Amino acid sequence: MAAAHLGMPVPVYMAEREEDLALRKLIDTLKISAGWDLEANRMAGRLYHFVMGRRAPVDTRAYVTTFGDKLEKGVHRFLWDNARDIDDLCKDFQNGPEYERLISRGMLSAKRMYDTYVLRTEEGGGEGAVYESALQMYARMAAFFTCQCFAYPSLRKTVSEVEGGSGRMESGLDFFAYFFKILASQLVSCATPVMRSAGLRQSYLASCFIMNPDMSTEDKTLSAVFRDLSPLLCSKSGVGMNLTNFSSGGKNVQSCLRLINSQVEFCNDKNLRPVSVAAYMELWHEQIEEFLAAKLPENPERCQSIFQGVCVPGLFFRLYEQNPDSQWHLFSPKVGGHLAGLYGDKFDEEYARLVRHGLYSSSLPAKSLMFALISAIIKTGSPYILSKDAINRHHWFETQGNAISYANLCAEVVQQPHEFTSTCNLANVCLPACLRARGEGEGAGAAGEGEGADRLSPLTPDLEFCFDTLRAAVRAAVYMINASILGGVCPTPGVRVMQAERSAGIGVQGLADVFAKLGRGYMDAESALLDARIFEVMYYQAVRASNQLVTVGGAPPHANWKNSKLSRGEFHWESWGVQYDSLFIERQLWEELRESVTKHGTFNSQFIALMPTAGTSQLTGLSESFYPFYANVSSKVSNKEEVMKPNITFLERVSPSDVPLLKYHGGDVSKLPPPLAAKYRNFLTAFDYSPEDQIRRAAARSPFVDQSQSFSFFLKEANVKSASYVKNLILLGHGLGLKTIMYYCRIQKQTSLTALECLQCTESPDSGDGVGGYKGGDEEPRSPEHAQCESPDRCLSCQ
């Protein structure tokens, strides 16, 4: 400020820099109370958007000039040619209430936006870096989707005729405005690869990949790990990888897992968006015990940067339930490898034949393997548990002889890659955006075609759930996913082959917020009813929109349409035994859709997949996925700082006079005195609800989730002192037919809501009391985010 002392004018850039420093100090001050002060949290977020907005280009022309070398040619040209109109559209949006909501999601939302999602001119985001603003990011995405519509006439025609209202959408700006409004209002959130890379040159937009490589020899194993896996990790996406056929000349599977682990760690070095691999193995493999031990804390060479999953045949569960001392036999893939292709009765028959002829490598009591499985779960939070019978019985085509025994990184996408590489293409609907003031818009009608709202809450008569908005969101998600499939780059030839099946996965976020805003608890009967209706409508609308791409747009059905169950008119929910009288949507509408689908086909092979959404839920400030609230106050810890993560829906309803007591108990409603506990009962967390009830709720929505759901166990520390408790949950999930019986096991310590850790269990799953069977874990306590997994951001691709 020497110039000022000499009476000289201060340069504008110096004044702005000093103002930014002052604002950052104010932000740091507000962050201290952001956990309990809703306005402080919102103000900190607004100010952070303001500060970072100064580092963004001033208008669209300046944006294209700054980032033009990164933009795909068509997107570059569209933004440049329509710059003035786009500026006007963005300005109108900024002057409306939706922009205020966008920048008022809190400090964590703003930090996440600029740390992870927006473009910058310097990868590290240095002092001189120029950033996209939030609206410029959404404009880039909208421009990409618009360009794909004009590149693919079927997409353009469908969007124009279905979304055009009384008149068709004709100009590029019409399409841009349609996509921009949905994205910027956060009605639909795309997966992280799309948010970061849509519209860029040579952009990888797939969320996750699934591999089933041949690992029967040393050469083939090395080829799978270095030739096939490496390009997928370098594309910054997560991978699900089947290891069931690993034999590799007698080598130990842990050495293979360490190879994979090292690749993941290398790719994550200096990487803004960490990636990982979920390795899957079936329970009959001769090295299953070594596989389960690969991540245990007592293993000096544990593979802490990857994840594991097991696929369990129904036969194992039945043997265990009949007699835990029954012998379970393990096989070499060279002898029993064909078991991998079988499920149900065919698996049972072949397993029995191999045992009868003494072709097994070894055997052990079923309870010993169950204990090894549960011990790994309690110590590490995984492996994921898939039901082999369920994922194959309910798959979109018959898999007997080539059965599926693996999933993607977050266990919600189930596909058969054959000798190629399957791809996940994801988006999620922000369900609270479907709430509206009662009486607005259409009246009640048939759920499939004009249902106005679901009126469930006399306690909060000002809000109702609008199925019109939900259907519009699902249609938009279908268009965006298909634009990403058609316009993205495939990292390997195998990915390109499987993209022809055009598998889509539409999920949700904010389900718990919807129930709370309607004045209901997560487990209330009315909430359960709305839960099932939401996913029925989503499945119906996704199939219908995909069918319209064929009937309206003239696109061909996906590559494997003739082999699909839908080609025979079989909806996913019918394989669950669901009858018309239990459905929300009228029978006539389902039958009309069946007729159209059978006659014309669908553009996509799959439709609904419920992913975790941990990343995009931070952008919106909503609860994750379909889960109950995880905590009412927690924090997000990164290598830079700790940012408070309050439950915004909770804070909006907290009386100021109740804050001291709520703060004393860390927002834990279950610890409040009875009157206050009753007042805030709608904000109980996932740890407060019965895990059995959560499993039943997951089973109730399963008929409408044609892929799977990242269903997790939320357990209190006292529960896992008895391994039999976890065992019973697994058996219940199997009995109710869940495809993903368990994605992750989160354990809440009794001492503190925000200090969670994995525990060590040393008692048998068949001992009931667990007395003396538990010892404290030797890992340090973790924040809520770190309780979920060792690498909390590893599933950004799915979010």
Curated annotation (Swiss-Prot):
Annotated site residue numbers, Interacts with thioredoxin/glutaredoxin: C795, C798
Top-level division of the source organism's lineage: Viruses
Pfam family, one: Ribonuc_red_lgC
Protein name (record): Ribonucleoside-diphosphate reductase large subunit
Catalytic residues of the enzyme: N408, C410, E412
Site (Important for electron transfer): Y743, Y744
Family membership noted in the UniProt record: Belongs to the ribonucleoside diphosphate reductase large chain family.
Complex formation: Heterotetramer composed of a homodimer of the large subunit (R1) and a homodimer of the small subunit (R2). Larger multisubunit protein complex are also active, composed of (R1)n(R2)n.
Organism encoding this protein: Equine herpesvirus 2 (strain 86/87) (EHV-2)
UniProt EC number: 1.17.4.1
Catalytic activity: a 2'-deoxyribonucleoside 5'-diphosphate + [thioredoxin]-disulfide + H2O = a ribonucleoside 5'-diphosphate + [thioredoxin]-dithiol
